[in-house]
Amino acid sequence: MNNSMISPSVVDLLEKIHDRYSLVILTSKRARQIIEGAEPQISIKSNKPLTIAINEVDQDAVEFEILEEGLK
């Protein structure tokens, strides 16, 4: 794991999602789902939707599919 102040680090997340654009789209869409009432897929102390979404991606709790025309 990287010794950064942010956990998980962007470098760690980019090992799962191979480009920054897709990472931003995935986490923002998931955060929006949480804001709209979706239950978090992980147990986490934070109540911030984006923090929850980022940690869900890090813990492989979010399923996604990358299509030629973009993220689904």
From Swiss-Prot:
It catalyses: RNA(n) + a ribonucleoside 5'-triphosphate = RNA(n+1) + diphosphate. GO terms for cellular component: DNA-directed RNA polymerase complex. GO terms for molecular function: DNA binding; DNA-directed RNA polymerase activity. GO terms for biological process: DNA-templated transcription. Its EC number is 2.7.7.6. It holds the Pfam family RNA_pol_Rpb6. Keywords: DNA-directed RNA polymerase, Nucleotidyltransferase, Transcription, Transferase. The keyword Transferase applies. Disulfide bonds: none annotated. The keyword Repeat does not apply. InterPro entries: DNA-dir_RNA_pol_omega (IPR003716), Pol_omega/Rpo6/RPB6 (IPR006110), RPB6/omega-like_sf (IPR036161). Promotes RNA polymerase assembly. Latches the N- and C-terminal regions of the beta' subunit thereby facilitating its interaction with the beta and alpha subunits. HAMAP family: RNApol_bact_RpoZ (MF_00366). Belongs to the RNA polymerase subunit omega family. The RNAP catalytic core consists of 2 alpha, 1 beta, 1 beta' and 1 omega subunit. When a sigma factor is associated with the core the holoenzyme is formed, which can initiate transcription. This is DNA-directed RNA polymerase subunit omega.
